[in-house]
């Protein structure tokens, strides 16, 4: 397996994003922050001996979801985003999903010697979600969370599945994420991101060979 790290920058007229990722966790840093004088403090920040997670998108609940995804995937992750939040949350959420997907794909490298498929369940109180992923190079997303509110915090509920769809498209994976039950939209969303993390962690884990896990012989 390779070092499995990546640094991705995405700059458009709508957002400026920088993401560093290590799929194996461990120390991680960005040499030059996009924030002037480090003026923005991460809403979702955690540092342990095994992981460094620092997320600042400008949308608190999105930070919380990305933090949960990184934590339970076993990643170290730094996300910096300056977006046009004076308009709404669409561009920031979508572009963060795209950039994170690109970073994940680059860090993963060739799909070789890994399980490829992964599945996971995660509860959060009354909510229960299921996720299934395939590192297939066939981007597709089916996301059914059954959210009822207009927003959770400052994040529009319609953008929560859209983030996952953008991540799947950019990372070129297939993912199915369903919330099976739950009454609270915060819980439904968080259990979904945690279930996805469990599935990704399994799919990217070594399978004991150096083979490409495909009858085609290639996943590219």
From Swiss-Prot:
Keywords: Amino-acid biosynthesis, Histidine biosynthesis, Lyase, Manganese, Metal-binding. CDD domains: IGPD (cd07914). Mn(2+) 1 binds at residues 64, 91, 186, 190. Its EC number is 4.2.1.19. It comes from the Eukaryota. Induction: Induced by histidine starvation in a GCN4-dependent manner. GO terms for biological process: L-histidine biosynthetic process. Present with 2100 molecules/cell in log phase SD medium. This is Imidazoleglycerol-phosphate dehydratase. It comes from Saccharomyces cerevisiae (strain ATCC 204508 / S288c). The lineage of its organism: Eukaryota, Fungi, Dikarya, Ascomycota, Saccharomycotina.
């Amino acid at each position: 397996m390779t070092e499995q790290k990546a640094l991705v920058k995405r700059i458009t007229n709508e957002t400026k994003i920088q993401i560093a990722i290590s799929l194996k966790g461990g120390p991680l840093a960005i040499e030059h922050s996009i924030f002037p004088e480090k003026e923005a403090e991460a809403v979702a920040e955690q540092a342990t001996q095994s992981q460094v997670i620092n997320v600042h998108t400008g949308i608190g609940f999105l930070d919380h979801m990305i933090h949960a995804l990184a934590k339970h995937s076993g990643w170290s992750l730094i996300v910096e985003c300056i977006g046009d939040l004076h308009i709404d949350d669409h561009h920031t959420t979508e572009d963060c999903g795209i950039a994170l997907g690109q970073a994940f794909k680059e860090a993963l490298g060739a799909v070789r010697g890994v399980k490829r498929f992964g599945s996971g369940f995660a509860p959060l109180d009354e909510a229960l979600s299921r996720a299934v992923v395939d590192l297939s190079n066939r981007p597709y997303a089916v996301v059914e969370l059954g959210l009822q509110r207009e927003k959770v915090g400052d994040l529009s509920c319609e953008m929560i599945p859209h983030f996952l769809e953008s991540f799947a498209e950019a990372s070129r994976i297939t993912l199915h994420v369903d919330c099976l039950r739950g009454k609270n939209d915060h819980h439904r969303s968080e259990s979904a991101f945690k279930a996805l993390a469990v599935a990704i962690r399994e799919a990217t884990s070594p399978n004991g060979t150096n083979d490409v896990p495909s009858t085609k012989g290639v996943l590219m």
